[in-house]
Amino acid sequence: TDAPIPALQPGGVLVRATASLISAGTDRAVIGLAQKGYLGKAKARPDLVRKVIGKAKTEGLWNTFQAVQNRLSELLPLGYSLVGEAVGVGADVHDIKVGDRVACAGQGYAGHAEAVYVPKNLCVKVPNGLDEESAAYVTLGAIALHGVRQADQQLGATVLVVGLGLVGQITVQICRAAGHK
């Protein structure tokens, strides 16, 4: 489905995408969930089933039914990490200018699209010399770096990274660069 170009809003950046990261695990999971029927979705997300039951108890069956139908009919865009050119900048955004290359993050913002609106706090300027494809990994790099920081290990410590998907592989590279074994 073609979507209209989003409007520029205060506090954000309108970006013409030039590269978007395809995350095989996340995108496949979203597509897989979308292809399931109601029962399959309920089995896959028992936490949401509990929420629906709680909502039915407090707001009634009809209101809950309508809320569930609205939620299930929403289109969930794929993607959450891209790079592109700033083609519009909110008046209150001062560190990004039209024409700057930016890397963007955020489910629901930095999806697989030709143009996206992204809040400023989810955008960063791309350094000169960094290619588009590498810059599109900004979100995964940030997730990996956050995990390393949360582990709070001393330089040279021995660390174990469990799971070597995209984030795990980037985490290993960050740990090696930080002198971890």
Model-derived segments and spans:
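Residue-level marker of beta-strand positions
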Residues: 19, 100-101, 115, 158, ...
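Glycine-rich beta-strand-centered segment in the early N-terminal region that forms part
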Residues: 6-22, 30-105
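Conserved SAM-binding loop and adjacent beta-strand
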Residues: 78, 118, 138-139
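A structural motif shared across PLP-dependent enzymes of the aminotransferase-like
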Residues: 106-120
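Mid-domain Rossmann-like dinucleotide-binding core that forms the NAD(H)/NADP(H) cofactor-binding site
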Residues: 134-181
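Glycine/charged-rich beta-loop-alpha catalytic/anionic-binding loops adjacent to active sites
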Residues: 67, 121-132
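Generic structural detector for well-ordered beta-strands
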Residues: 2-4, 117, 125
